[in-house]
């Protein structure tokens, strides 16, 4: 989104507040409570409060302000961000072996996101609804049912799109951040001593005083920066400057004031540790604050759900996930999409998590491993981009990487302590997604290599057909072709069984480029191979929708006229069997067969009218 128009900058910045900062903006609901709840062997003590506040403040400065907003966001692919984009950028100017390692890192990072995204809606909404414990303690048993009801409504409206409702997100989140600031400032004024925690010396003293326990406590501190990846992932929607402007002018000051306000409250009233966020508010404001918190957490959950849809589309288009139905919910905004399978699978997982963990404090134990793991991978990938793509001095890049890892690795290591108490959940989900993505990519590559290794040369085949033509029938036939130099299987089988050929044959290749968008000038390349054969290569970015009708329109503009309803589309449908393999590769082969059976069929994927498609089967051993 362009920010060149100065009049639109405030609107874009406001929109960024509504979408990008939902997750990190709702962290004050539970972060300080988890830090000082007594689980680490110490309670609400002055040194502990100052230590945690200092750690939270400097994490927000170093990780969010310096690492992500200043450094990582420099790495963009035509304005787009995200872990898979970073993976693609990092592998552009490296050796094949290094690229493979970087791809694995990127896929692990993407898998971590899938693992963590199940927890975010659950912990956010539950922590807001838990404000009922303060307003009406007798309603404690309603927290789980109400959380499920709220999230059920949220997942149900996804198919209708969030365009209209989304217009309310920005003002609601702006109100949320202003309330955070006011509540915090009110408490700080009553006890300004808490501002001493801005001094990083208190963070150092915290480690010296509490020793090993302080290291484990980092697992709770990291809750303050969950959602930081959204800043980079949503860069393509809003642009770098509005996201940075929103952070430094609204979000960061509001978060700092609220965290320090909670700290000031706890110094005077240690018993407020039950729920320091809601106890910041006067009694008359509790119910309005509860409603606002519920709205803010729903918006944070919406941002995460939209992020899952975007990541899934990117993974599908880059060939790491099987094709699935992707529905555009807005004619104006290409980023607003709905993926039914992902939506309801995520909903089911979130409900199971809520019922299983019952309280946001229990969920906090599962939160953080995937976030910090992604942070480590982001540090490695982004510094690789700085060295290989930007050609920065290798010693300077090494210093940056060391500085990042000196923060990331301790945070990740501290979260490993959560493994048995809930951290296994996002790791298990991430492992499942990593297995699915690597299986689809590698087995798909094996299949295509198997199909093409004995394929006939395109040029030789066309020359033979022109010299000794079979029976020609009127009309145009389009054969979907994956490889430019090999005759499509469907063409070979049509000649073998029907022994006829249309008077005009088009070999169509649809290609996804490593970029979010492809300019219309480069959309279609046409090459006449013989008097009756044409090759058409259509290129799309991974954020664009493959559309054969649009390709035909572009072909018509360049002199190759085609009418969709007068053209026959020939496609090959592979029936796969798993050959002799070691047991673990047989399992992977079985998983690939399952994924392919449930994948979206090519006619639906490319938006081709079903009555114009002829599928010819072939059996392939993998």
From Swiss-Prot:
Membrane topology field:
Multi-pass membrane protein
Which Pfam families would you find in this protein's record?
K_trans (PF02705), K_trans_C (PF22776)
Record's InterPro entries? K+_transporter, K_trans_C, K_trans_N, Kup
Catalyzed reaction equations: K(+)(in) + H(+)(in) = K(+)(out) + H(+)(out)
GO molecular function terms here?
potassium ion transmembrane transporter activity; symporter activity
Primary localisation category: membrane
Q: Which UniProt keywords apply?
A: Cell inner membrane, Cell membrane, Ion transport, Membrane, Potassium, Potassium transport, Symport, Transmembrane, Transmembrane helix, Transport
What is the role of this chain?
Answer: Responsible for the low-affinity transport of potassium into the cell. Likely operates as a K(+):H(+) symporter.
- Compartments, as annotated in UniProt: Cell inner membrane
Q: Which GO terms describe its cellular component?
A: plasma membrane
PANTHER family per the UniProt record, alphabetical? LOW AFFINITY POTASSIUM TRANSPORT SYSTEM PROTEIN KUP (PTHR30540:SF79), OSMOTIC STRESS POTASSIUM TRANSPORTER (PTHR30540)
Please list every transmembrane segment annotated in the UniProt record, as residue ranges. 9-29, 49-69, 103-123, 137-157, 165-185, 213-233, 247-267, 276-296, 337-357, 363-383, 396-416, 419-439
Please, which domain of life does this record's source organism belong to? Bacteria
* Native organism: Salmonella typhi
What family is it from?
Belongs to the HAK/KUP transporter (TC 2.A.72) family.
- Protein name, entry field: Low affinity potassium transport system protein Kup
């Amino acid at each position: 989104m362009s920010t060149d128009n100065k009049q639109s900058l405030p609107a874009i910045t406001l929109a960024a507040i509504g979408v990008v900062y939902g997750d990190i903006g709702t962290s004050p609901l539970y972060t300080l409570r988890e830090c000082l709840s007594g689980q680490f062997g110490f309670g609400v003590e002055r040194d502990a409060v100052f230590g945690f506040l200092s750690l939270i403040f400097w994490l927000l400065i170093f990780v969010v302000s310096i690492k992500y907003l200043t450094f990582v966001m420099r790495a963009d692919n035509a304005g787009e961000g995200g872990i898979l984009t970073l993976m693609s950028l990092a592998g552009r100017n490296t050796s094949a072996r290094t690229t493979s390692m970087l791809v694995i890192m990127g896929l692990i990072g993407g898998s971590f996101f899938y693992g963590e995204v199940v927890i975010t809606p659950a912990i956010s909404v539950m922590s807001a609804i838990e404000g009922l414990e303060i307003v009406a303690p007798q309603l404690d048993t309603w927290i789980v049912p109400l959380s499920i009801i709220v999230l059920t409504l949220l997942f149900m409206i996804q198919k209708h799109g969030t365009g209209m409702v989304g217009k309310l997100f920005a003002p609601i989140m702006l109100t949320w951040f202003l309330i955070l600031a006011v509540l915090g400032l009110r408490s700080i004024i009553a006890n300004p001593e808490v501002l001493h925690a801005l001094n990083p010396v208190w963070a150092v003293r915290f480690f010296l005083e509490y020793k090993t326990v302080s290291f484990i406590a980092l697992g709770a501190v990291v809750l303050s920066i969950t959602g930081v990846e959204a800043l980079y992932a949503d860069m393509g929607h809003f642009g770098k400057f509005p996201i940075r402007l929103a952070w430094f002018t609204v979000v960061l000051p509001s978060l700092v004031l609220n965290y320090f306000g909670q700290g000031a409250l706890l110094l005077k009233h240690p018993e407020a540790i039950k729920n320091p966020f809601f106890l910041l508010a006067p009694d008359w404001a509790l119910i309005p604050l509860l409603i606002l918190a519920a709205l803010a957490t729903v918006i944070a959950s919406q941002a995460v759900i939209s992020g899952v849809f975007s990541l899934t589309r990117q993974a599908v288009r880059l060939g790491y996930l099987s094709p699935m139905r992707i529905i555009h919910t807005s004619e104006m905004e290409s980023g607003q999409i709905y993926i039914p399978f992902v939506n309801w699978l995520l909903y089911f997982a979130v409900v199971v998590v809520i019922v299983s963990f019952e309280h946001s404090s229990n969920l906090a134990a599962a939160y953080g491993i995937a976030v910090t793991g992604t942070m480590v991978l982001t540090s490695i990938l982004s510094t690789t981009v700085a060295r290989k793509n930007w050609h920065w001095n290798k010693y300077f890049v090494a210093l940056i990487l060391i500085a990042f890892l000196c923060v990331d690795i301790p945070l990740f290591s501290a979260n490993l302590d959560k493994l048995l108490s809930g951290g296994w959940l996002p790791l298990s989900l991430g492992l499942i997604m990593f297995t699915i993505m690597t299986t689809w990519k590698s087995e798909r590559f094996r299949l295509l290599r198997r199909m093409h290794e004995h394929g006939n040369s395109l040029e030789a085949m066309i020359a033979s057909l022109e010299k000794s033509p079979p029976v020609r029938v009127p009309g145009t036939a389009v054969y979907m072709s994956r490889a430019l130099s090999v005759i499509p299987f469907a063409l070979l089988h049509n000649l073998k069984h029907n022994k006829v050929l249309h008077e005009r044959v088009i070999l169509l290749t649809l290609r996804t480029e490593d970029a979010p968008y492809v300019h219309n000038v480069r959309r279609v390349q046409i090459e006449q191979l013989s008097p009756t054969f044409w090759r058409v290569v259509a290129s799309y970015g991974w954020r664009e929708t493959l559309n054969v009708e649009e390709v035909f329109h572009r072909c018509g503009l360049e002199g190759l006229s085609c009418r969709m309803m007068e053209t026959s589309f020939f496609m090959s449908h592979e029936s796969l069997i798993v050959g002799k393999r070691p047991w673990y590769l047989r399992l992977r082969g079985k998983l690939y067969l399952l994924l392919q059976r449930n994948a979206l069929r090519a006619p639906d994927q490319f938006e081709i009218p079903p009555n114009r498609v002829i599928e010819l089967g072939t059996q392939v051993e993998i």
